[in-house]
Amino acid sequence: MNEIQTHIHGVSIRRNFVENLPYNPQLKKLLPGKRKARILSEVLFWQQVRARTFHNIDFDRQRIIGNYIVDFYVKTLGLIIEIDGSSHDEKEVYDGIRQTYLESLGLKVFRIIDFDVKHNLTLVMKELENYIISNYGI
């Protein structure tokens, strides 16, 4: 049975709750600093999704999953949203390892470029809608 989470443009979106995710409590002490860092692209994105303003979907900010802190997490969809800054080869390798691990838990990862959030947020939100529809729509 597919429990409906919400609707986007008339398309029913099914829940995909991933249970028993690993959690490293040692990372909890890092959360206040990350939240206070106020990275502009994260603040702009958060303004679009906080308090269920994006299709009544509940987003968490700075969520610990395993040994990682993800930018945003939608528990009911098992969806991670990561905002990527400027690319460096080392960062890309790290992001790839991290994404492989997160996907091995049954999660999906939607990546956004920092520049796009700052300069074309409307398009970013449309791309997120399309991603959710294509991955969770029924």
Predicted regions and their residues:
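Solvent-exposed, charged helical/coil patches
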Residues: M1-N56, N135-I138
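Basic, amphipathic alpha-helical patches used to engage nucleic acids or provide basic targeting signals
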Residues: K34-R38, R61-Y131
